[in-house]
Amino acid sequence: MANNTWKLIATTALISVFSTQLAKSVWKEYKLSCAANKNKTVSRPRQYDDHLFREQLARNYAFLGEEGMRKIKEQYIVIVGAGEVGSWVCTMLIRSGCQKIMIIDPENISIDSLNTHCCAVLSDIGKPKVQCLKEHLSKIAPWSEIKARAKAWTKENSHDLIFADGESPTFIVDCLDNLESKVDLLEYAHHNKIDVISSMGVATKSDPTRVSINDISMTEFDPISRCVRRKLRKRGIATGISVVFSNEMLDPRRDDILSPIDCEHRAINAVRDEALRHLPELGTMPGIFGLSIATWILTKVSGYPMKENEVKNRLKFYDSILETFQKQMARLNENKERSSLLGLEEVGYIVEEMFRGKSPISGYSTKLALTKWEANKEISLTNVVLMTKEEQEIHEKRILLDGEKLTAVYSEEVLDFIERLFKEEEYYS
């Protein structure tokens, strides 16, 4: 009897030790698994009844139809920048039925994020923006697959980051506030033939009725759009990029905020400083930009009838201006090789980006021509000026043939303005 009791005690002890060791082993494995998965940022879609999905999105189904909603569900959209504009884009795409998105942003929520971010709260301060969005959106749309990447997008890591899982995005949304990275991303999407839309500047804007979406070539009255457009033209991209922008000009009654001239100057400085955070902005405007982008994507991919982007195509106009320059070069007996340095692309750039489509002398925008500016300098972007044909004739005779000084022909104001444009071009070059 006693012997059996000891056997029972020994067996119980062995089982207890084995169970303890097993529990420790399982716990250790669990901790290792947690550590390994700590940095994984993919939210897998949970099972969600299709009837509930349809009920939740009943109004979208009524508006866009069965086929339109099917197309939206099939999209894989990459949003680069999860801050003041990007957070609204992500939220409304997921709320509207998109089932797969990737969010890319290296930054954390800060206290000033609460002014413009779509869903961040005080307790989110210090948390990665992508994690904040993923947690919030997973509660709204448990069917969604959200890939959150707390990394900076760069030219060097672009392919590995966007195509990390071997999947090709159907759309890229640019919400970056670093202008160099913004231009790099737009160039990347354009060259890889991925549909893209970009958010331009919300700074100094306050009129929601002036916000519109169009091709980059059609933007106006927005210094940030102009900076981006000009940099893209330098890379051979004049059209084919959709952007949301505001054509609102700063009200002169608010010159205490920023004068129109200073606005352009500060925008160019923002390019040099790489970020757009140096300009004053109204907290509601980023949301309007983000909602506009989300709406545009939803209607575009679903096939809902919408107005197509206009594209500025003035090749015939540029060709006629180029002809005036080539004829001048022939009259001056300039080396043909030198005069051929300017083609239609360069002429378009000079006309639209450097001189804003008008003569710096008279301000006229009709009967335009190009002329060599200084007789003793080589042909280059900083020695060619846009002016009217009549002004070209006078300039050619007095400056290029008779050898008069520029100061004898033009006012100090005109010369300073042209010199400023040339210095600006030197920066972009």
Curated annotation (Swiss-Prot):
The family note in this entry says: Belongs to the HesA/MoeB/ThiF family.
Membrane disposition: Multi-pass membrane protein
Main enzyme class: ligase
Q: Which residues carry this modification: Phosphoserine?
A: S259
What name does the UniProt record give this protein? tRNA threonylcarbamoyladenosine dehydratase 1
Q: What else is known?
A: Present with 8430 molecules/cell in log phase SD medium. ct(6)A is involved in promoting decoding efficiency. It is an unstable modification that can be easily hydrolyzed and converted to t(6)A during nucleoside preparation by conventional methods.
Q: Where are the transmembrane segments?
A: 3-23, 74-94, 279-299
Q: Which PANTHER family match?
A: TRNA THREONYLCARBAMOYLADENOSINE DEHYDRATASE, TRNA THREONYLCARBAMOYLADENOSINE DEHYDRATASE 1-RELATED
> Does the record carry Mitochondrion as a key word?
yes
Gene3D superfamilies to which the protein is assigned, alphabetical: NAD(P)-binding Rossmann-like Domain
Can you name one GO molecular function term for this protein?
Answer: ubiquitin-like modifier activating enzyme activity
Q: What is its EC number?
A: 6.1.-.-
Q: Which organism is it from?
A: Saccharomyces cerevisiae (strain ATCC 204508 / S288c)
What processes in GO biological process is this protein linked to?
cyclic threonylcarbamoyladenosine biosynthetic process
Q: Which GO terms describe its cellular component?
A: mitochondrial outer membrane; mitochondrion
Going by the entry's taxonomy, the superkingdom of the source organism is recorded as Eukaryota
Name the UniProt key words of this record, in alphabetical order.
ATP-binding, Ligase, Membrane, Mitochondrion, Mitochondrion outer membrane, Nucleotide-binding, Phosphoprotein, Transmembrane, Transmembrane helix
- State what this protein does: Catalyzes the ATP-dependent dehydration of threonylcarbamoyladenosine at position 37 (t(6)A37) to form cyclic t(6)A37 (ct(6)A37) in tRNAs that read codons beginning with adenine.
* Gene field: TCD1
Deletion phenotype, per the entry, is: Displays only the t(6)A but not the ct(6)A modification in tRNAs. Unable to sustain respiratory growth under non-fermenting conditions.
Per UniProt, subcellular location reads as: Mitochondrion outer membrane
